[in-house]
């Protein structure tokens, strides 16, 4: 064994549930993981439910698997916490039983958002100024939907919390929340790091369902005998307040001080900038969330489906390349990057149309497409198209970062790049060239769960603070310096792409094509 003390983080992600065990030096010891799906509710367009009964059973198995793989006694786990996708909520009755749950991008409340904007035309901007959130993925429209469509559940609702909080409720029986994830509900003060129940009251919703708030790294209870029997964790193990996946992931990457910048490249890409104030964007283009570090807010741009688009491209169009990669014994993405590396900057003029830059107040995207393809197979090869997708994700990230830098006044010469996309050497170099900034790749596989272990360690006195341990344990793998000539070329590509994207949005507006995704109420 590496140490006698261990910490366990539950990670309720978009695509899977996980339980990850770390030692006190931040070394990953084991992981239990199962994929899950968040399915639409029959007859409810754009819904994405959270099946808390099924998903709790999955998490039970993940915890048992992680403990078994670690080869340790459950009593060696000195604290347990949880993180999750953000925006998702769970509602409870007066006895603490779950009533209703939705996952992060549930967009069922289309009519309700339109109603709120009509009846309270200034409320969204007013609420954004206080919370950093719009109605796009907010809790209030979802509660209004429940009130109008499932009144029997709404009347029974006595409490709510976020999905990461829910996992801790299952362990401890305590219904509580914390700023980083509750902050994504849109009913939470950036400045005061507390609920804003008056928002709910203003639009005619219950204002007494918001639970106590504790900062990340606070012990809120202990593992109950029931939860112990279900999970294999020792009864009495401290249950520690965790946080939202992106903010705890930032801690796991060492992005914990004002002015630091990160890009997280997963299914969605997030562009994150730490700032020392609760400032919001006058243009309402960018969301702002509480960090897990008190005193820091995090401006966040979001690029939709960058990772998912890559998977679609691989699976739908690259069967031959996947077969060749398998024959060579390498990852298919690595082989596609090899092909893309032979293509010049700008990908022979190919313009991918997928995610727009972020416009949080009017958040929607054009129909997916590739523009400006050539019928010359050498110019529009699979490698060229793949490179165009990598360049496009970097360009949209750059545009979001520019928006953030403009309203925050923050500037930085470097970007911490993490997530699956950061494994690609070409993609990392493209991000450096597009942004004109040094790109640093940390040595960490499970940054979000690692951030959770920091919270556990603070709670039991192993570490003095999340920020301090994050800085002491972060290690760097690689760094990429920008090429100034490529930077200039990418500025031209970005301008062409913006004009092309505007034209594609007009087709959506005219009903000719279908938006890849749009927020409720648009």
Describe each region flagged by the PLM.
Residues 46, 61-328, 516-517:
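Glycine-rich phosphate-binding/catalytic subdomain of phosphoryl-transfer
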Residues 344-441:
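Activation-segment/catalytic-loop signature of the eukaryotic protein kinase fold
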Residues 18-20, 173, 330-369, 520:
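Conserved ATP-utilizing enzyme core subdomain
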Residues 10-15, 83-85, 243-244, 264-268, ...:
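A short acidic Gly-Thr/Ser loop motif
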Residues 156, 319-323, 461-522:
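Acidic, glycine/GT-rich loop-and beta-edge segments that sit at the periphery of enzyme/chaperone cores
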Residues 114, 248-252, 303-305, 311-314, ...:
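Glycine-rich phosphate-binding/hydrolytic loop that grips phosphoryl groups
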Residues 43-47, 99-103, 288-300, 385, ...:
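Short beta-alpha connecting loops at secondary-structure transitions
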Residues 1-101, 156, 228-229, 233-238, ...:
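N-terminal glycine/serine-rich phosphate-binding loop of ATP-dependent small-molecule kinases
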């Amino acid at each position: 064994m590496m140490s006698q003390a261990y910490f366990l983080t539950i990670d309720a992600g978009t695509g899977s549930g996980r339980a990850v065990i770390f030692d006190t030096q931040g070394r990953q010891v084991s992981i239990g993981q199962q994929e899950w799906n968040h399915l639409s509710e029959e007859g409810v367009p754009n819904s994405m439910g959270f099946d808390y009964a099924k998903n709790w059973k999955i998490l039970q198995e993940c915890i048992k698997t992680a403990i078994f793989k670690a080869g340790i006694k459950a009593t060696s786990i000195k604290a347990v916490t949880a993180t999750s996708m953000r925006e998702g909520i769970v509602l409870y009755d007066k006895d603490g039983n779950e009533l209703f749950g939705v996952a992060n991008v549930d967009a069922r409340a289309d009519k309700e958002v339109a109603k709120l904007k009509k009846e309270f035309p200034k409320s969204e901007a007013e609420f954004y100024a206080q919370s950093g959130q719009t109605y796009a993925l907010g809790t209030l429209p979802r509660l209004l939907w429940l009130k109008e469509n499932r009144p029997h559940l709404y009347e029974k609702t006595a409490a709510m919390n976020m999905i990461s909080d829910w996992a801790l409720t299952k362990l401890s029986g305590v219904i509580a929340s914390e700023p980083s994830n509750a902050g994504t509900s849109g009913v939470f003060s950036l400045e005061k790091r507390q609920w804003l129940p008056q928002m709910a009251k203003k639009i005619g919703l219950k204002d007494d369902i918001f639970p106590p708030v504790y900062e990340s790294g606070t012990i809120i209870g202990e593992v109950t005998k029931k939860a112990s029997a279900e999970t294999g964790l020792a009864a009495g193990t401290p249950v520690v307040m965790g946080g939202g996946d992106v903010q705890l992931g930032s801690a796991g990457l060492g992005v914990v001080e004002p002015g630091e910048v990160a890009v997280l490249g997963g299914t969605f890409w997030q562009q994150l900038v730490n700032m020392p104030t609760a400032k919001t964007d006058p243009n309402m283009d960018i969301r702002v969330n509480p960090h897990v570090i008190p005193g820091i807010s995090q401006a966040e741009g979001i690029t939709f489906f960058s990772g998912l688009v890559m998977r679609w491209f691989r699976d739908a169009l690259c069967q031959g390349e996947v077969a060749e990669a398998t024959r060579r014994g390498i990852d298919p993405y690595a082989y596609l990057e090899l092909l893309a590396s032979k293509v010049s900057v700008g990908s022979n003029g190919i313009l991918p149309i997928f995610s727009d830059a972020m416009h949080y107040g009017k958040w929607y995207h054009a129909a997916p497409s590739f523009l400006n393809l050539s019928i010359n197979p050498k110019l529009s090869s699979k490698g060229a198209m793949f490179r165009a997708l990598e360049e496009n994700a970097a360009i949209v990230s750059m545009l979001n970062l520019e928006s953030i830098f403009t309203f925050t006044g923050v500037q930085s010469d470097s970007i911490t790049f993490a997530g699956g996309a950061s494994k690609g050497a070409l993609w990392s170099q493209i991000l450096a060239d597009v942004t004109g900034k040094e790109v640093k790749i940390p040595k960490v596989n499970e940054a979000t769960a690692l951030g959770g272990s920091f919270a556990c360690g603070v709670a039991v006195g192993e570490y003095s603070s999340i920020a301090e341990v994050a800085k002491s344990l972060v290690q760097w793998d690689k760094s990429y310096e920008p090429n100034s000539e490529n930077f200039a070329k990418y500025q031209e590509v970005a301008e062409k792409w913006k004009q092309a994207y505007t034209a594609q949005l007009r087709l959506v507006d005219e009903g000719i094509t279908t938006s890849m995704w749009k927020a409720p109420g648009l």
